[in-house]
Structures are given as structure tokens and as C-alpha cells.
């Protein structure tokens, strides 16, 4: 059985180049300014993934608690993470009010409407989406890191969630790590939560790479994907997921850059009757910041690397 898995995996890796899933330009202008296309699949193989963390506890509809675009360039070993603040006030296609919080798009129309809303407002073409709810997140973390993921826990966080740990560095398992990425009752509020989400995402990437860093361990990759699919929803087929994970192993990640949208000083806090408290963003300024971030060679700013 192991030999069969190795043969299948070798065929998968040999048959999928780094550009197999990038058929279109990845950054599409939403303003009159033209961006020079430097993202052809035969040159860089750029892939854009929409990562969604939903607040679902089993309900048929839920809001997106985390919205992250991960742009991956395997041959260059670069990952760029863009966190879109869920309270950003944007135009949602088909919404009776026109504008609402970004996470309302997911509540109304799931992954597809959220992808369209992001494309219409920010000009980012998403290749694939992956969503995971609270229970799925906890189970997935326990699957890839049975001993937990080490993070720095504050006293405020411990008090807020009644966590059974001491302040400082702790290896948190699934359910406790979920509290870490959801916490927002300090001076940083949602902005701190976004930073922690990006931090944990990078550490998950490291766990995956360590788990499958040897050829022998790759034999377990198909079974791992089967188990992982029990905890996430994705528009990707199993073979596509295997190909992406294999690239993470065979193309070492050299740089991870991160950006938060809206960028600093590009929004104001507003309140609307139909949506409550929102971040009313300067859309043009954020589009330009986003384009600049994606088109610059990595590392864009080492200060933001984890």
C-alpha cells in the first residue's frame, strides 16, 4: 500500500507544474490605472487563495470571522498574506442596500459572493477558496500539530476566555488556539486579531512543511488530505490540494510578507442603521496599496515577516 501511495504521489508531483492553476492575470485593475501584467503562469505560476474562517457553529448561514488572501509563488518561494478587515464597508453585488460590511457578503452568498465582492472592490482574482468553521479549525490544528502551536498568550486573553495557562509562551492545541485567534478585547481590538490570524497561518505552514519534509513522510500525504477535507470546505479537488501541498515541501518558502486592508490612516469609523459600526475605507487608496504590495518583489517589508 505504501508503495502504491508513493507511485501515485510521484505521478502527481511529476505531472503538475507550478503554474497549473494560474490561467489568468492575478491582479486586475479596478481603476483607470493599468497594471503591467507580470503574473503569467508560464513565468511565475502565481496562485491566489481566499482563506475564510467562519463563525459557524453548525448554522446554515454564518459570517466570515477571518478573510485572508494568500498569494503563493512556488518557484520564487514567496507568500504574500492580505487580511481584509471584516468590517470594511464595501459594495456588495445584489445587496438591497448596496453597501455593507465585507463579511455580510459571505453571510448572504457564501464563498462565491465573497470572491466576487473582493474582485469588484479590490481587483483581486481568486483562483481557489478554502473555508473552515470554529470546530473545523480546532480539529484541523489537532491534526497537523498534536502537541500544539506555540504562541505568546497575554493575561487579558487568559482572563477573557478563562484559559488554563500562564501568561507568556504556550503550546496551544486546537480549541485553545481558536481562542487565541478570536481574542479582540484589548487595545488592538480587531486589528490585533488580524495580526494573530496571520501569525498562526504562517505557523500552520511551518507545521505542514515539517510534517512532510522527508520523502517517506510524503507517503502519508494523500491520507492526510482525506482527513483534512473532513474539516474544511473548498472548491479544490483532492489532486489540486496534493499538488499545492507538495509545492510547499519542494519549493522552500523564503519570504512571507503581510498587509492589512484597510491600510493605516485610510479609513474612518462610521455607523449605519443597517450595518452598525463599520470601517469606511478610502477605496482608491487601498486599491493602490494592494497593487503596490502585490507587484513589489519579496521581501516587501521584512518588518512584517513572521
Regions picked out by a protein language model, each given a short descriptive name:
Residues 1-20:
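Sec-dependent N-terminal signal peptides of Gram-positive bacterial secreted proteins and lipoproteins
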Residues 17-306:
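Non-catalytic, solvent-exposed segments at the cell envelope interface
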Amino acid at each position: 500500500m505504501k508503495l502504491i501511495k508513493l507511485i501515485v504521489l510521484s505521478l502527481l508531483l511529476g505531472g503538475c507544474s507550478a503554474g497549473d492553476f494560474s490561467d489568468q492575470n492575478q491582479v486586475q485593475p479596478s481603476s483607470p490605472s493599468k497594471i503591467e501584467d507580470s503574473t503569467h503562469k508560464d513565468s511565475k505560476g502565481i496562485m491566489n487563495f481566499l482563506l475564510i474562517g467562519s463563525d459557524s457553529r453548525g448554522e446554515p448561514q454564518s459570517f466570515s470571522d477571518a478573510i485572508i488572501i494568500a498569494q503563493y509563488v512556488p518557484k520564487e518561494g514567496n507568500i504574500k498574506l492580505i487580511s481584509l478587515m471584516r468590517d470594511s464597508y464595501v459594495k456588495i453585488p445584489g445587496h438591497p442596500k448596496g453597501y455593507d460590511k465585507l463579511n455580510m457578503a459571505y453571510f448572504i452568498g457564501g464563498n462565491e459572493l465573497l470572491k466576487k465582492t473582493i474582485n469588484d472592490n479590490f481587483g483581486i482574482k481568486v483562483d481557489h477558496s478554502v473555508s473552515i468553521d470554529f470546530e473545523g479549525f480546532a480539529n484541523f490544528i489537532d491534526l497537523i500539530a498534536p502537541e500544539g502551536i506555540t504562541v505568546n498568550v497575554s493575561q487579558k486573553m487568559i482572563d477573557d476566555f478563562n484559559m488554563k495557562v500562564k501568561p507568556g509562551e504556550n503550546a496551544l492545541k486546537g480549541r485553545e488556539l481558536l481562542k487565541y485567534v478570536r481574542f479582540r478585547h484589548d487595545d488592538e481590538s480587531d486589528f490585533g486579531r488580524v495580526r494573530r490570524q496571520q501569525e498562526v497561518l504562517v505557523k500552520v505552514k511551518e507545521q505542514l512543511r515539517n510534517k512532510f519534509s522527508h520523502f517517506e513522510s510524503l507517503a502519508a500525504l494523500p491520507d492526510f488530505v482525506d482527513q483534512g477535507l473532513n474539516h474544511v470546505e473548498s472548491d479544490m479537488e483532492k489532486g489540486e490540494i496534493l499538488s499545492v501541498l507538495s509545492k510547499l515541501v519542494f519549493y522552500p518558502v523564503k519570504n512571507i510578507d503581510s498587509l492589512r486592508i484597510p491600510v493605516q490612516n485610510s479609513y474612518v469609523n462610521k455607523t449605519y442603521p443597517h450595518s452598525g459600526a463599520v470601517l469606511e475605507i478610502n477605496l482608491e487608496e487601498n486599491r493602490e496599496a494592494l497593487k503596490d504590495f502585490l507587484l513589489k518583489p519579496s521581501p516587501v517589508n521584512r518588518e512584517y515577516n513572521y
